[in-house]
Amino acid sequence: MKVLYPVCTIFVLKIDMPMDILFLVGGLLLILLGANGLTDGAASVAKRFHIPSIVIGLTIVAFGTSAPELTVSISSALKGSADIAIGNVVGSNTFNTLMIVGCTALFAPIAITRNTLKREIPLCILSSIALLICANDVFLDGSGENILSITDGLLLLCFFAIFLSYTFAIAKRDGSMKEPEKEHLQEEDEIRLLPAWKSALYILGGLAGLIIGGNFFVDGASGIARGLGVSESIIGLTLVAGGTSLPELATSIVAALKKNPEIAIGNVIGSNLFNIFFVLGCSASITPLRLTGITNF
């Protein structure tokens, strides 16, 4: 029996692993399709009600590109896989900053504007500091373990609301709300105005894709972690984070190929802020998230 046990274990892993990979890939595809459908439907509704393109970009489009991270982290939190929920955000932000900016710079030099240096980058650093403070209960108040509590989640969501208010105020002050720039007008022209029934279908179908795909993706990631004998934190920081960052990577590379590499910086900063303030904020508000030594210090 002792000789047969390892053989049986390997046999089971060989059977389960392809299914887990199928769940992972299939779930990610459903998430991407769902995010695309939801974004198209919501953007069409926004255009129908004459909502400015800058508002659409800051809300609907930003949600669309970060929907994989949001879906996976919330699904993980609901399933009790806190390591995947947190590792997904931390790993995704690391992937965004190093991989996406690096790949974009390989295609074209990236010019950092003065506003980006003065506004967006400090906000991005602030979000990381806020997460560092919320996630280090043991170091700060001597608690027995590090937990992102419901209070921490609500605090992060408050920061997200402040960030949105600040962004809208800056856009209004600069005249972007009343007199959109040429590039914003072009973006607005590219938004398809769908019939009301089709917009509703896109939105509902997109939500269904996000929910079902999120469950499949988390189940696949957890199964792969068990099959490889590694922690869910490692899978969350690497495989899951890389998969959920694919929309940002594709957007940034396409922007670089179209000679607009500066879009990559805004894309990365916006995604990183959204991930920490909104994704982790929502996840921790639903259920407390316990941090391990891998996802924390």
Language-model segments: what does each one mean?
Residues 4-297:
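Hydrophobic alpha-helical segments, chiefly the membrane-spanning helices
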